């Protein structure tokens, strides 16, 4: 039986990323990292086609060498789901324990939405998938119902990120919002209409229905540039659309790491990441958001308190290493398949 294991990632690997080392300590086995950077393919129909293509082709490459691996951890959910897709489609013998991370799903309307749901159900219920990690407690029951499977198939773990080091995080007086998944930027613009607050939105697939003098939308702001924009904002806004969809956790942790106050929609997926006094969490009510933003801009003590308590919470519970250790405990306790 092989004791070689692999992690499938879709981002540019940094030297300090320690999941492989943490998994090696927990399992007593060798771990390697296989990378296919797909998070760069955004912003145009052609880029989206390339990204989708690699979501299927890279897992197929892994399938061809699957007998090398005792355990597979898919950081990019579609790398893991499509590994299971190919194995099920080709009726291959199961030889690897598969953990799928960073899972998120929202049902879409219409013919394509139904087709996507059938594809996701086929993958999620595949016998080649051993567990799927989601980042809020409520999702386990929601996803189990959506895909007609048992809740135990889904494992809840809290997200974590590496601390963001920025020596200069001066406040330049604008609201910053970023992210694609489940965002309700139209609501945020309704909040800002008629106010003097300036706002910068970093999102490659959002265009306002009408121009706003106080709102700038950046379609090509990613990675370090996005973090730089966040580092100089007054506060970070996370307006979310569907209360049942897990989203916004990464941005809230980035803001807390930088010591920026957060205002966000009151949704279930965020509640696992905040405590009283660490963020302004309110329903999507225009008047309530306007009042909260006004206070964040005019009450310095309040803004500093929210930012400071959020930063302390991040350091104590949401570091990247803490997340890696949570993943390692789940994977190390898994049943593995011989051949």
Q: Where do the model's predicted regions map?
A:
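A short, well-ordered alpha-helix in the C-terminal region of glycosyltransferases
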Residues: 295, 302-317, 323-329
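Acidic donor-binding loop of glycosyltransferase active sites
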Residues: 230-247, 260-261
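Short acidic/histidine- and often glycine-rich active-site loop of Leloir-type glycosyltransferases
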Residues: 210-211, 267-281
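Donor nucleotide-sugar binding/catalytic pocket of nucleotide-sugar-dependent glycosyltransferases
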Residues: 129-144, 149-165
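Conserved acidic donor-binding segment of nucleotide-sugar-dependent glycosyltransferases
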Residues: 276-287, 294-301, 316
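Conserved catalytic-core segment of nucleotide-activated headgroup transferases in glycan assembly
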Residues: 170-213, 217-224
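Short hydrophobic beta-strand element within catalytic cores of glycosyltransferases
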Residues: 257, 261-264, 281
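Membrane-proximal helix-turn-helix segments that form the acceptor-binding/catalytic region
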Residues: 60-68, 92, 111-132
């Amino acid at each position: 039986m092989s004791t070689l294991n692999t992690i499938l990632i879709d981002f540019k690997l940094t030297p300090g990323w320690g999941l492989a080392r943490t998994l090696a300590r927990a399992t007593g086995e060798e771990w390697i990292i296989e990378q296919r950077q797909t998070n760069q393919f955004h912003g145009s129909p052609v880029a989206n086609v390339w990204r989708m293509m690699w979501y299927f082709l890279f897992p197929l490459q892994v399938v061809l060498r699957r007998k090398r691996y005792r355990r597979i951890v898919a950081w990019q959910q579609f790398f893991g789901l499509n590994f299971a897709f190919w194995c099920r489609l080709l009726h291959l013998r199961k030889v690897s324990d598969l953990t799928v991370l960073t899972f998120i799903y929202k049902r879409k309307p219409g013919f394509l939405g139904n087709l996507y749901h059938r594809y996701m159900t086929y993958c999620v219920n595949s016998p080649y998938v051993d567990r799927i990690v989601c980042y809020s407690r409520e999702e386990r029951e929601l996803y189990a119902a959506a895909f007609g499977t048992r809740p135990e198939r889904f494992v809840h773990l809290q997200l974590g990120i590496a601390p963001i080091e920025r020596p200069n995080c001066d406040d330049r007086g604008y609201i910053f919002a970023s992210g694609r998944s489940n965002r309700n930027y139209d609501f945020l613009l309704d909040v800002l209409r008629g106010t003097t607050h300036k706002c910068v939105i970093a999102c490659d697939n959002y265009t306002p229905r009408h121009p706003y003098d106080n709102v700038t939308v950046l379609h090509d702001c990613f990675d370090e540039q996005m973090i730089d924009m966040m580092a100089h904002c007054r506060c970070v806004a996370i307006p979310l659309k569907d209360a049942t969809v897990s989203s916004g956790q990464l941005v809230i942790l980035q803001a807390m790491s930088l010591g920026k106050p957060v205002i966000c929609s009151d949704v279930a997926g965020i509640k696992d990441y905040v405590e009283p006094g660490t963020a302004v969490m309110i329903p999507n009510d225009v008047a309530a958001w306007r009042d909260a933003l006004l206070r964040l801009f005019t009450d310095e003590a309040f803004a500093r308190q929210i930012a400071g308590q959020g930063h302390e919470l991040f350091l104590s519970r949401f570091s990247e290493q803490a997340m890696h250790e949570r993943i390692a405990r789940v994977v190390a306790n898994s049943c593995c398949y011989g051949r």
